[in-house]
Curated annotation (Swiss-Prot):
Cellular localisation: Nucleus; Cytoplasm
A molecular function (GO) term: zinc ion binding
The protein, known as: FCS-Like Zinc finger 17
Triggers of expression: Up-regulated in response to prolonged energy depletion. Down-regulated by glucose, sucrose and mannose. Induced by NaCl and abscissic acid (ABA). Induced by cytokinin.
Function: May act as an adapter to facilitate the interaction of SnRK1 complex with effector proteins, conferring tissue- and stimulus-type specific differences in the SnRK1 regulation pathway.
Protein's gene: FLZ17
Family under the similarity heading: Belongs to the FLZ family.
Keywords: Cytoplasm, Metal-binding, Nucleus, Zinc, Zinc-finger
Length: 126
């Protein structure tokens, strides 16, 4: 019967041995004398209202690297982005409809506009 070891195992070797399968590279350093202004200001101000962000207060993040001073600012930016996406998809849908419209009846166009109206109702803030 063969003995099989499972788990972590400490392997020691003499460091004076030259192993052909080991490559040692130093890390790369980018020598940039002028960093972007966005790099210098990362999480310094709210992305929406430009209020200064403080280290002792909560920062509300959105899409990975956008910081906001409050939930309201973050949610407003989310609504703005959703509206932009809706407008872009609406334009694409209308362009597609116009290309594919081969004498289609009024009922199809009415269904399309009713669908768009319903989608826009989702973004109306009371």
């Amino acid at each position: 019967m063969t003995k099989i070891s499972v788990g972590l195992q400490l392997v020691t070797r003499d460091s004076r041995e030259k192993l052909n399968n080991i490559v040692i590279k130093s890390s790369l350093r980018l020598n940039r004398s002028n960093p972007n202004i966005s790099e210098l200001c990362f999480l310094k101000t709210c992305h929406l209202c430009n209020k200064q962000l403080h280290q002792d207060k909560d920062v509300y993040m959105y899409r990975g690297d956008l910081g906001f001073c409050s939930r309201e600012c973050r949610e407003s930016q989310m609504l703005i982005d959703d509206r932009k996406e809706l407008e872009a998809s609406t334009k694409m849908m209308l362009a597609s409809y116009r290309r594919c419209n081969n004498g289609a009846g009024k009922s199809e166009s009415r269904n399309l506009f009713d669908d768009l109206r319903r989608r826009r109702q989702l973004f109306i803030v009371p």
